[in-house]
Amino acid sequence: MFQKGTNLFFNCHNCGVGTNLGNLIKQVDPSLHKEYVLERYKSGESGFSNFKSPAFDIPAPRFDKVAKEKHFEHAEWVSKLPSGHFCIVYCTNRRFLSTMIDTLLFTPNYKKFCDALVPNHGKEITADARLVIPFYDKYNTLIGVSGRALENSDYKLRYVTLRTNESQDKLIYGMDKVNTNELVKIVEGPFDSMFLSNCVGSGDSALIQTAKLIDAENKVLIFDNEPRNKEIVKLMDDAIKLNYNVVIWPDMIEQKDINEMVMAGHNVKKIIKDNTFTGLTAKMKFIGWKRC
């Protein structure tokens, strides 16, 4: 519960429901709500009045991190698979770090996995083997999963994402690990974010939208290296105009994303550090980078 102006508001971090205190009381006890309304208007404590904010402060409730789920039906942690398993081979070929592998799941049947996790989800899901990326919020609550198709999977949909709650908030990967008091890196893909410290994955190219949802003073936007992609070029131009720190990839980089750069042997952390720009410098570097 938190205070805004003269009103108190309630927000459930489990189901995502939010309302003011009056509506909450009305749902719980209609008769008590009538008394509540009378008292507020009698004292002048109405959202439509010039009532002075109360002198006392209501402390914000403290929410501690919960323990993450350790067991999932129809899935196993990748780190527990035998060394020759094709999912392990896939991760090894993509140069996934051991810290990355520890956070990922494997399911031989993504449909069964999703059906058990969120019954009656209503999505059409293929019953194929997938590498599963769990999404958590800042309290370690599971808020979604994304299944990445593997070598022997149906490639109709490379990624299939499923929410585990009814919230309409944007799914952002890595919010359980990010420290907003330090520089926050924002990339497109969840896998790419795992190669960098204090980094989140937007799940798409809408990095500006994601940046606005993260309450951090220092942020850097790291778009994929696609100088011929008109959409990416436009989004990067917008980010520069909004004075964000933006990575402008140097000409020597031919790969599209961070994972591909790692596989090619590049020191991605140093490249990002040396090629982060803002303002006029970013604009000049951007003009030299784009190809459309």
Where are these regions (language model features)?
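TOPRIM metal-binding catalytic domain and adjacent DNA-binding surface shared by DnaG-type primases
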Residues: 28-131, 139, 178, 242, ...
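N-terminal single-stranded DNA-binding subdomain of primase/primase-helicase replication proteins
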Residues: 1-27, 120-127
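TOPRIM fold recognition
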Residues: 8-16, 20, 155, 181-184, ...
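Phosphate-handling DNA/RNA-contact segment within nucleic-acid enzymes
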Residues: 111-218, 231-233
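Generic secondary-structure boundary/loop-capping signal
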Residues: 48, 78, 142, 156-159, ...
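A generic structural signal for secondary-structure junctions
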Residues: 29-30, 142, 263-266
